[in-house]
Each structure stands twice: as C-alpha cells, then as structure tokens.
Amino acid sequence: MASVPCSFKLSAHRRSSSKLDGNNKQCSSLVERLRDKTKSQVPKSITCINRLEISRIAPLHATMNSPKGFGPPPKKTKKSKKPKPGNQSDEDDDDEDEDDDDEEDERERGVIPEIVTNRMISRMGFTVGLPLFIGLLFFPFFYYLKVGLKVDVPTWVPFIVSFVFFGTALAGVSYGIVSSSWDPLREGSLLGWNEAKKNWPVFWQSFWNSSDKR
C-alpha cells in the first residue's frame, strides 16, 4: 500500500517537469523569432541613416578638405604589402581598388566650392565688364568726332584705344579668379590685391602641373 502513493507522486512530478520543458521551448522559440525580426529590421534602418549622413557630409567634406580647389594634391603614403605566393590576382584587385579610391579623392579635391565660384563670377563681372563697356563706348565717341565735329582723328587711335581696353578686359578674367578669396569661410577685400598676391603662385603652379600631366 505504501508503494502506490510514491508512484503517483513520481508520475505527477514527471508531468509537471514535462510541462515546464514545453513552456521553456515555446519561450525560447518566441525569443529566437523576435531576434530574427530585429536583426532583419535594424540593419536596414542603420544603412538608410548612414546613407543619408554620407550624402549630407560628402560636399561639406570636399569643401573643408580642399577649400581652395587649386594646388597640387597632398601626397599619400601607401602601405607596403608583402608578396605571397599564389595570391597575385588578389593583389591586382587590391591595387585596382586603391587606384579607384585615389581617383575619387583627386576629384573631390578638384571641386571648387559654390561660394568661391560665386565670388569669382561677381569679381569677373566687374574686372571684365567695366573695361569692355568703356572700350565699346569709344567707337560712337570717335564716330561723333569725325562725322559730327569734323575732327580728323587718325585711324590708329581707335585701334590702340580698343586694344588697351579689350586687353584689360581679357586680363580681368585671370585677375577676377585670382583676386577672389578661395577660403569659403572668409570674405576677401574690395580690390582683392592681397588675395591676388597669395593666390597667383598657386594658380600658376596648378596650371603648370596640369600641363605637365598632359
């Protein structure tokens, strides 16, 4: 008679343990499902945020990296890799990737900021437009002297005057570029003489470097 309640207790204990095991398995399966869902959703949001941040930061990085847009690019130090036998194709792929990265960096350095471009255009409008306008005004002036006032003006005088003013307008293109402030965060002076002294050697150096590469 004493063995019957013992067996009953053991069977009840086994049933309760089997129920606990089943509940634990269900909980673990739910946790794994939640983890899979979060893993599939979180990287997408992170990648979208990263893309937006990169698209916003790229033009600012190009501006602050090379605000002038001129001059030789800084030299880069390339890491030396030890050659390994049987990995020649991998090394070639790595070299091609490095070359592509270098080309992209050079393009970013060559970008002139929009603020600096607007300064150059406004300065060229003054240095080119003013002498060109004055040179064009001399044509009706000489015509009035000759026809209206009957003044005998030599033919070489209009040619010299037009040559001087048109040449000044042509030189104003270069002066408008050089006399502008190439720093996006700093406005230049009115005439831009100090900026021209600083920027002129850099302008010629970049010009000769580009001609040597060709």
From Swiss-Prot:
Residues 36-124, 174-214 are stromal. It is found in: Plastid, Chloroplast thylakoid membrane. It comes from the Eukaryota. Residues 1-35 form a transit peptide. Involved in early steps in photosystem II (PSII) biogenesis and in maturation and stability of newly synthesized psbA protein. This is Protein PAM68, chloroplastic. Residues 146-152 are lumenal, thylakoid. The gene is PAM68. Its main location: plastid. Pfam families: DUF3464 (PF11947). InterPro entries: PAM68-like. The chain crosses the membrane at residues 125-145, 153-173. Disruption phenotype: Strongly reduced growth. Pale-green cotyledons and leaves. Residues 1-26, 62-111 are annotated as: Disordered. Residues 75-84 have a biased composition (Basic residues).
